[in-house]
């Protein structure tokens, strides 16, 4: 009888302990995507957070922002939503550092109520302020733009950029960013250290899947080699890019 009573008491203690354990509730996170290439400024860009979503159990809230600069043009692509990744503090760095085309990213995963609440580009302001400026010029110039093939990067909107000495190769690629409702294909052109893939080591930025197709211009030259000279103009190549867009 004593043993049975003791076991019953142990069971009661166990049930009480279980009842005191915190419940694993689904987390509420902001849900948003952004893809902007016009009038983007480090100081006046604002992200309106209007939607939220309920995540699956054990998922956290993610926010990933990519900031791109080439010449005087800027672009922002970003994703907010649920993530199964482990939590990690804010991480900000240059994936491709200046001079020339630069690509920086900010990303974090958190696990508290609506914690993915970044609404501005302040982290990139601080990152850019810490980067030394390069002013030594070269004799090279390249077309420069970032944006949609049929919008911001139409030939009439493409500018010519004088390249710094440390980034005197002309770069051009079509990038595709995909995450949740974010599905954006865009063109980036400008001065770079070389003309190879800039994001070869970054198939994912946070949850954003990155696809980079490089040397579209070279492909155009190869196709038209029988009809055009190798000195084909950038404006003609840009027109070909428009025809090749998705």
From Swiss-Prot:
SUPFAM superfamilies the UniProt entry points to: Snake toxin-like
GO cellular component: a single term: side of membrane
GO terms classed as biological process: binding of sperm to zona pellucida; single fertilization; sperm migration through the uterotubal junction
UniProt cross-references to Pfam families, sorted A to Z: UPAR_LY6
Topology class, membrane: Lipid-anchor; GPI-anchor
Transmembrane segments: none
Chief localization: membrane
Propeptide residue range(s): 226-246
UPAR/Ly6 domain mapped to chain residues: 142-223
Glycosylated residues, chain numbering: 117
Subcellular location: Cell membrane
Keywords: Cell membrane, Glycoprotein, GPI-anchor, Lipoprotein, Membrane, Repeat, Signal
Signal sequence residues: 1-26
Name the UniProt record assigns to this protein: Ly6/PLAUR domain-containing protein 4
Source species of the chain: Mus musculus (Mouse)
């Amino acid at each position: 009888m004593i043993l049975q009573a003791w076991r019953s008491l142990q069971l009661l203690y166990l049930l009480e302990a279980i009842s005191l354990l915190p419940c694993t509730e689904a987390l509420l996170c902001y849900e948003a995507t952004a893809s902007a290439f016009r009038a983007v400024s480090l100081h006046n860009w604002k992200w309106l957070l209007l939607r939220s979503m309920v995540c699956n159990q054990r998922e956290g809230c993610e926010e990933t922002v990519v900031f791109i600069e080439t010449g005087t043009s800027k672009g922002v692509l970003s994703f907010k939503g649920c993530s199964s990744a482990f939590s990690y503090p804010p991480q900000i760095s240059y994936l491709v550092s200046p001079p020339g085309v630069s690509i920086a990213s900010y990303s974090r995963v958190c696990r508290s109520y609506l914690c993915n609440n970044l609404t501005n580009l302040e982290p990139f302001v601080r990152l850019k302020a810490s980067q030394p400026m390069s002013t030594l010029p070269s004799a090279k110039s390249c077309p420069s733009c970032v944006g949609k093939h049929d919008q911001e990067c139409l030939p009439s909107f493409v500018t010519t950029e004088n390249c710094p000495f440390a980034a005197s190769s002309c770069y051009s690629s079509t990038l595709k960013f995909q995450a949740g409702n974010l599905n954006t294909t865009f063109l980036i052109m400008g001065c770079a250290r070389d003309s190879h893939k800039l994001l070869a080591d970054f198939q994912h930025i946070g949850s954003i899947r990155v696809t980079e197709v490089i040397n579209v211009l070279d492909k155009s030259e190869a196709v038209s080699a029988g009809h055009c000279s190798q000195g084909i103009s950038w404006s003609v190549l840009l027109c070909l890019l428009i025809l090749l867009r998705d």
